[in-house]
Amino acid sequence: KEMHNGKWTKKIGVQLEGKAVLIIGFGRIGRKVAELLKPFNVRLLVVDQDIQEKMKGVEILSINNALPQADIITIHASGEQQIIGDSEFKLIKDGAFLLNAARGQLINEDALINALESGKIVGAWLDTFGVEPYTGPLRKYSQVILTPHVGSYTVECRKSMEMEAVDNLLSAF
């Protein structure tokens, strides 16, 4: 945005190498995330109650054991039940990053706001929300990136989803 406005402001970032990345939900998308992260020499932590197949270089932990170790938490779980609320945010180390590309209701929004204001979470990216379109208070936080539920919004993904739907219909008959 700044460069579009003619400003050349450099902000220092955070390197992935050496960080612990927690993937909550280790289905198809969670596994792809793990594969993409491996070249960055990160420690991969996974929380998934229904894990079907282990992957080399991945540590499978309970959420209570994984959260205190994670520098970055990325959520790709299915379901509708809240996963991260007040008690889970208390376990997270100060200065962590949080990404949610799963379901909005998996994170308690009030607890996330408290974590942002306290510095527990220093950056968040949210692509899903409990109520959409989203008009809530997270819009005012500069350290939060909000996208309008576009994680699967590509031509290729939509075609794949359509083909899968057709296959499911055909296999039912």
What is each of the regions a protein language model found here?
Residues 26-27:
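Glycine-rich Rossmann-fold phosphate-binding loop(s) that bind the pyrophosphate
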